[in-house]
Every structure is written in structure tokens, then in C-alpha cells.
């Protein structure tokens, strides 16, 4: 009986923890041990990493050139481009088709808004949980 109560309590805690994540679009733990998160906040996406926190309107973000879900031969690219203070933050990864547990280069690439080469990145730790739930019905799909 105690085991059943313990399992039930654990299930309720786990369920409520996942329920609070319903607005998360992408999250991971960086190789530096810090959380990288993009979540829905009202009509905006909110990017959060370390001390950098900003919002973009969802309707604008999903139409940015770098926001795309592209299915190719063997791989699918998931990317969401957000902008802040003249910088572009492209959050996403590449995934082999048919293997939802493998992530290639997950994280965020940061570049100047004028399409110059990247000036930095946030790399997700591939050994920690990576969560994604991109708005596939809103984003550019190829």
C-alpha cells in the first residue's frame, strides 16, 4: 500500500511538473551547465540564457528567414530565429529521420542581424535532456 501511495504521489508531482512545461518550445542544459529556454509567454516567444532574456512576437518570429522546419533526405532541420539588439539567435538542431532521440548540434547560434558569420553559440549538452515542441503549423516548412 505504501508503495502504491508513493508511486501515486510521484506521478502527481511529475505530471504537474510536465504541465508547467506546456509553454516551452525548446529547452536544454548548455555544456556550461546553464539552462537555455525558449517558451511562449502570451503572444511572444521568450528567449532565456544566462543573463540574456528577451521576447519576440510569435507572428514575427515564425516568419523570419531562419525559422524553418526542413525535411531532407535522411535529416530534418528544426530552427527558430529570434532577434534582439541587432543580433539573430537561431535556436534548434538537426535530427536524423526516424530517430527522435538523436540531436545533431542542438543549441543556439548567434550572429549579427546583417548575415555576417556567427559570433557565438550556446551548445546543448547532448547527455542531458533536450526538449522541443516547435509550432509546426505556424513555421515555414520545406
Predicted regions and their residues:
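Sec-dependent N-terminal signal peptides
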Residues: 4-13
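Cysteine-centric segments in proteins
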Residues: 20-142
